[in-house]
Amino acid sequence: MNTLAEKLVDAWKKRDLIKINSEELPKSREESHNIQKQFQDVLKKKTVGWKIGLVSKNLQEGAKVNGPMIGKIIDETVLMNPLKVDYSKVPDCILECEFCLKFLEDTKMIPGAEHKTGNYEAYIALELVSTRVHSESKKDLDPINMMNLNIADNGGAGAIVIGDQIKNLDKINLDSIQVEINLNGNVTE
């Protein structure tokens, strides 16, 4: 087993951050996915979905990376709104406004699949992007090495808060949806 995978599992269990050296960094996207798989195999937690970031070529070019960032959504990290988030359980996290899809049947991602209706539901979501790796270990990484490390680190998965269902998705401008966050008494939209 890869030492980095073992260290990431230990950090996940302890809700802690680890320091790594340059020799431990994954050398390729393939190695990153292998480390993530080892991480999942040792962690032995139920996978309930996937998180996929940087999906468009424009985003990838802007971030100077060579593909999307993929991680698994683990059952215990799916949180339902309304709730209070204990940030000590999601180390070094940032919030990202997202939306998520719940597929109601097996769906193959083939050309034209996006035109099928009735096989999924859409929900407002907040992702708590997290890491198990101390920022000191990341400070000098170029975008590709950072991406490979983030993939190995389960795609930066921390937790996801599922909000209200988005009805009539095809008729809604997603940019128009308001999200209210109460962070220690400070309400923002």
What are these model-predicted stretches?
Residues 2-189:
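Catalytic-core "active-site belt" of small-molecule-metabolizing enzymes
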